[in-house]
């Protein structure tokens, strides 16, 4: 189930926070509740991705993106992600989430998010998102202009650029093995 009450709490908590630069870092604090756990009594890996919404969407609100999406009838979608899990977050532990836009290219905006306990990073996700309209993907330079920001991205870190290039090599739609195809409806 989506954490609607926690999402509402975050949006209310940061509704009057100072405006955030497009590449500024949004910092928020959270608790791992029992309903976030997997059978090993730690934060579930899928739930981790859901909880990252609690940082990413308030970050978008603080940067001024959400009102622009509404006014222009644009949407935002996740076009890819890469996650690293390194340390456990257990029941009732507090953690700090950092969310920032790392940069953009001609199609996508790249967001870097981390969850930390103290100074130790527990996990990190790289999110590639697209702003969409009825006509398709809105170029990020156009989105930045709407935000009053420079249309040119800061240089993408090498690891993000390499991930994007590697992902472009991935076949789509996926090439299914013959035994997998046998289970698809005709």
Language-model features and meaning:
Residues 47-70:
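Active-site helix/loop of acyl-thioester processing domains in fatty-acid/polyketide metabolism
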